Amino acid sequence: MNQFKVDFKEFKQALFTWKYWRMLAVLALGCFTFSSVVNGILIPHHFFAGGLTGLGLLFHDSIKEFIPFSLLYALMNIPIFIIGYREFSLKFIMTSLIGMGLYTGSLRLTEGILISINDPMLAAIFGGVIAGFTTGFYLNLGGSVGGLDIIGTVIKKRLAIPIGTVFNMVNFVVISSNAYLYDLETALYTGIFMYVFSWSMQKGQIGFSQRKSVFIISSKPEEVAENVLK
């Protein structure tokens, strides 16, 4: 109970900061952009995405007549949040729930949207760039939409399996299923989308410039500092 009070206090304090609301604004933009790519590019071209969205698209392909993808994604997140509740702070869980709600709502709002790019290669690249950058932006600010981020972290803690390995295993299943359900060419375009998305997300998260720190250990720090500053 004491820990819950501490976590609740931390979350309550975050709600009254400009930084948190800026993150939510970027998160909302990212969710809307990514859901537009899902409904406007991925579904029409039969591409799959990585992570939980990809698994959701895989299952939704056979039940799309009965349940909208937005509802399916929300249902898939329920057991994930139950598992993650004991592993993460209340602030992270609440932020992820808000993000999941924004993403689910955006998926519903953008249903039926069509981004008119007939060339599948251009569609995969364009979708990957747009979705990747906006996702990277909100991740950089501490945003989350739940999904495999939570599962990957839990598996890493309990089984010592790197998060990247978990994502790679899921993506392998998604691409293989894409090839089985459609054809190899479509699966390759899915792979291209995933690669471009991953690259763009990384750039959106850490930027194009990389900084390096160098530690100099010396018994004559004044002389070293003088020469470095010259």
Feature-to-residue mapping (PLM):
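Core subunits and conserved enzymes of cellular information-processing
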Residues: 2-221
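Short amphipathic alpha-helix segments
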Residues: 219-230
